[in-house]
């Protein structure tokens, strides 16, 4: 009887050792840049690997989504992976928010199934039709985004216009979904380490 109780307690303790939520695209919150590079992703590019914030971009993921696009990962020193974004270009063949709307709504439905109703919806434009993408270049004219939250994760789905002049036969915008996992405790941990460095005097 005692042994069964001990086993049960051990299972509970082990299950509580890693309470991080599941990260998207087959990645893991807290994983390192080196582990990410070892995952054989296509088109991997790394910048500021040894900096406070490191960045990795790739054309694939361990568990890719159904659309073609790019994956952007951010790593915080001492914490590992803290944000992951997928972005896909839309409406290459026109200036209306057509393909983009279809993909945006499809992703929104999938996010709602997994994370529940969005906590914030900001979807408005003063100029629609073939001016939609020009309008959302300026937040005072329009924005198209939804924000979700679950288990300490913040998820933002948004539509953004391409920079500069919009050109025929090129995507007019991007639909992206960004996941961030950075709790207050994690921020305090990083700040504590940085404060100790600043206070140290080894001269």
Roles of regions detected by a PLM:
Residues 2-8:
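Sec-dependent signal peptide recognition
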Residues 3, 57-59, 67-70, 132-134:
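Residue-level detector of functional hotspots within protein domains
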Residues 9-11, 111:
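Membrane-embedded hydrophobic alpha-helical segments
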Residues 13-16:
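C-terminal motif of bacterial Sec signal peptides marking the signal peptidase cleavage site
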Residues 19-57, 89-203:
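Non-cytosolic coordination micro-motifs
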Residues 61-105:
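Mid-chain, structured segments of secreted extracytoplasmic proteins
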């Amino acid at each position: 009887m005692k042994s069964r109780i001990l086993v049960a307690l051990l299972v509970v303790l082990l299950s509580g050792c890693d309470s991080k939520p599941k990260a998207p695209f087959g990645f893991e919150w807290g994983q390192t840049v080196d582990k990410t590079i070892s995952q054989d992703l296509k088109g991997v590019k790394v910048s500021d690997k040894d900096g406070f914030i490191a960045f990795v971009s790739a054309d694939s993921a361990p568990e890719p989504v159904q659309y073609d696009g790019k994956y952007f990962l951010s790593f915080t020193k001492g914490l590992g992976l803290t944000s992951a974004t997928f972005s896909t270009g839309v409406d290459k063949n026109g200036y209306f928010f057509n393909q983009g709307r279809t993909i945006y709504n499809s992703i929104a439905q999938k996010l709602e199934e997994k994370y529940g109703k969005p906590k914030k919806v900001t979807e408005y434009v003063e100029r629609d039709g073939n001016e939609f993408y020009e309008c959302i270049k300026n937040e005072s004219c329009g924005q198209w985004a939804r924000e979700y939250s679950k288990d300490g994760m913040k998820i933002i789905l948004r539509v953004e216009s391409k920079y500069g002049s919009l050109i025929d036969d090129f995507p007019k915008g991007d639909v992206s979904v960004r996941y961030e996992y950075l709790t207050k405790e994690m921020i305090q941990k990083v700040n504590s380490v940085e404060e100790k460095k600043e206070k140290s005097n080894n001269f």
